Amino acid sequence: MKISKFTIMEKIITNHHRVIFILSVILFRIILESSYINAIPNSLLFTSYNLSPSFNNYLISWAIFFLLIPFISDWFTKASDYFFIIFLLVVITPMLIIYGYDAVLSNSTSNSIFSLVETVNSKSIIGIIISFLFIQLILRLKMPLFKNLPVFKHGFYIAITISSLFVVFLIFWYYISGVYFNLDLSKVYDLRVFNSNLSSKGFFAYTNGWTYNIFNMFLLSVALLKRKTILVILIICVQIYFFAGSAHKAVLFMPILILFLYFFSNRTPSLIIIPISLILICTMTMVLFTFFDQRFLLGIFLRRLFFIPADLTFAYFDFFSTNPHVYWSNSVLKSFISYPYDSLSVSFKIGSYIGEPKMYANSGFISSGYAHAGYLGILLYSFILGILVKLVDYMSKNSVPPWFAASIIITPFIFVLTSADLLVVGLTHGMFISLILIFLSRGVGLAQK
């Protein structure tokens, strides 16, 4: 009996899956490091770029990287598996690279490893490690409260109805409000404020985001689940329409993420595809930049996805290490605590601090947690986020396919990890809406789909 080369390769991958996964993760870091050295200097970060490697920092960064790898899974069995691999590869790895290659930013002139703990960059790395491991701990705790969650017999169809109503409303609202429709990615920043002033005032600031971030992507996931090809195409066209009206690039790329989750998870639960895909994206971006001087993908992927969030995290720690913390005086505690920075928001304050006074320098939950209450703020946000991630795992277990739950929650996950305060993601970016949709989708026999 003749065995095909594909079958042999499949057996090799299955038998050595964990090893191949770890090697692909390591290769991803090596390629991302190469891009930081060779490509990023030509696509400036918001703070100063200093390629001044520190031997001690570099060794520590690799040691931390290897210590965290065992905490991520190489198989996709629940939504949290995606959360942690994104956390490590997209958030932590770029920070470790900057930490190892920028001794000037680290304020480190000493050769002593112990002295590095006192630098701003080291405080940032400590904060992000604490958060990663604390969320891991939360997910390992038993929470009997989740076992009492009710199941709605027709909840899935209620979720579809609500989502459809919001989508139809926004289609008409964008047309009625008079937004300027634009498909040119290079013009989105010029039109974002203009379109927002027309269509996103008051409560619409929330509902519009919920619609294109969550409701329409939920409908896309349902269409994929039911294998309705025409409906999938229609929903993607609607999402392109929402991109044209919102002027947010992320809106355009959300369907790609969900299609990726659906097609690859249906073929195999292996998560090797994540580092391999990131390797291909980084390599393609660098090839286009090196040989064709194409900087568009360099700006979107390498710069915006990986290094700007990392760079801004260091900026947040640098500023709030020597300036007053906010203690939620700009939001839930504003009636009890005075805000220390007049009318300037935290994001604009950081923008001014790094020399970009007109920039909305928003960062992920670790930066915002530190801005509010230092390491205590990081622990509090990590605890809340850990509870929410565990809730997603529990609600989707034996109820909906893992890819389906991940598709609904993936956008809020990315926002909270890279570019927004946890409370903002919960409300504005629709994390709480995502949880409600997953909750309603339980109990209708979707797990076997």
Predicted regions and their residues:
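Membrane-anchoring hydrophobic segments
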Residues: 1-215, 219-220, 273, 380-381, ...
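Juxtamembrane/interfacial segments around transmembrane helices
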Residues: 206-222, 261-267, 284-290, 326-334, ...
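Generic transmembrane alpha-helix motif of multi-pass integral membrane proteins
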Residues: 66-74, 218-223, 239, 258-262, ...
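Hydrophobic alpha-helical segments of polytopic membrane proteins
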Residues: 5-6, 116, 120, 128-133, ...
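Active-site beta-strand/loop microenvironment that shapes enzyme catalytic pockets
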Residues: 238-252, 257-261, 366-394
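Short hydrophobic alpha-helical membrane-embedded segments
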Residues: 84-87, 207-212, 228-235, 249-254, ...
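Short coil/turn helix-boundary motifs
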Residues: 79, 226-227, 267-268, 373, ...
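Small-residue-enriched transmembrane helix-hairpin modules in multi-pass membrane proteins
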Residues: 8, 13-17, 23-24, 34-55, ...
